[in-house]
Curated annotation (Swiss-Prot):
PROSITE patterns: RIBOSOMAL_S4, S4. NCBIfam families: PRK05327.1, rpsD_bact. Coiled coil: none annotated. Belongs to the universal ribosomal protein uS4 family. This is Small ribosomal subunit protein uS4. Keywords: Ribonucleoprotein, Ribosomal protein, RNA-binding, rRNA-binding. GO terms for molecular function: rRNA binding; structural constituent of ribosome. Residues 96-156 form the S4 RNA-binding domain. CDD domains: S4. SMART domains: Ribosomal_S4 (SM01390), S4 (SM00363). One of its GO terms (biological process) is ribosomal small subunit biogenesis. GO terms for cellular component: small ribosomal subunit. One of the primary rRNA binding proteins, it binds directly to 16S rRNA where it nucleates assembly of the body of the 30S subunit. With S5 and S12 plays an important role in translational accuracy.
């Protein structure tokens, strides 16, 4: 399955909420009709069944993090193997992806842009270049912009925009040095309350 490259706002309208696939700073313009699904009959919102609600929640989270279906299912299997709450484990695994950490640290305006930085070898972890977006960052890992990439205008612009976003408490970022530390694993209370991971667990538990 190919990665979605179409209009980002269409995905947000499909899920009925801002997925922050654009800049991650400003809310989507009211003219974009976020509460109306795309298409000719978007205004008609059929009542979802339990399965429909579970599926929509899974699609929403998958799109937020930019994960393909097969990869998302593998994350769920891994979360289920770990001790503790499966749903929370799933979110922690997704938050620990290198592309997500790069985005959270403010080096990119979107996760898609962060994924591109990683793939183009602009990111180092503990001094070594890592070009795998799904690389799992561990506690105390130092994530930084590669020296030769620090002059990129888009990275500097992203750091400026990041000042307008709420800074994650589980990360420590030095914007001047363009590096950050993954201080701790995020707790559920640190993450979006707009995600209902229990619905995803119910979906995959069937």
């Amino acid at each position: 399955m190919a990665r979605y490259l179409g209009p980002k706002l269409k995905l947000s309208r499909r899920e009925g909420t801002d997925l922050f696939l654009k800049s991650g700073v400003r809310a989507i313009d009211s003219k974009c009709k976020i509460d109306t699904a795309p298409g000719q009959h978007g205004a008609r919102k059929p009542r979802l069944s339990d399965y429909g609600s579970q599926l929509r929640e899974k699609q929403k989270v998958r799109r937020i993090y930019g994960i393909l279906e097969r990869q998302f299912r593998n994350y769920y299997k891994e979360a289920n193997r770990l001790k503790g709450n499966t749903g929370e484990n799933l979110l922690v695994l997704l938050e620990g992806r290198l592309d997500n950490v790069v985005y959270r640290m403010g080096f990119a305006t979107t996760r898609a842009e962060a994924r591109q930085l990683v793939s183009h070898k602009a990111i180092v972890v503990n001094g070594r270049v890592v070009n795998i977006p799904s690389f799992q960052v561990s506690v105390n890992d130092v994530v930084a912009i590669r020296e030769k990439s620090k002059k990129q205008a888009r990275i500097k612009a992203s750091l400026e925009l990041a000042e307008q976003r709420e800074k994650p408490t589980w990360l420590e970022v030095d914007s001047a040095k363009m590096e950050g530390v993954f201080k701790r694993v995020p707790e559920r209370s640190d993450l979006s309350a707009d995600i209902n991971e229990h619905l995803i667990v119910e979906l995959y538990s069937k």
